[in-house]
Amino acid sequence: MKKRVSKEQIPECFWANRPKFLQWLGKTILTIFDWHVCGSISEKYKNKRLVAIVAPHTSNWDGILGVAAVAGLDARITFIGKHTVFRYGLGAFLRYMGGIPVDRSKPGGIIEHAIDQIRDIEGAIIALSPEGTRSKVLEWKTGFLRIASELNA
């Protein structure tokens, strides 16, 4: 039977070395929802910054399944989320998983804030939703391009 997700899909430099229970939980959630993580990242990208475009972002389930995939892969993946989700215990967990809260009511600083948070992370995978929202959009926002350019990702 084909594995749904495996940490062997990414170079070791991107491994987070989180607890085995968390890896198991991520894999179990993906199994329940019949999701797979397809493909792998080549060793030639190790110790580099990569930007992964995650689209379309249309549901709150995207975040749950995304965090499950991050846990199942045991990956050090940085992602941006709406600041209101980062409250109480959930906020601490999301930060532990690589989340960066952003306040979208202050749009001028979102990209700069994200870049400042990510700049010092070597060998980072940055997962971004180019829509910037769950709402249907006709065009993607360009922040992910600015982040990739600034970080040489």
Model-derived features: positions:
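Extreme N-terminal tail/first-helix region
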Residues: 1-38
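Soluble catalytic domains of membrane acyltransferases
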Residues: 15, 32-153
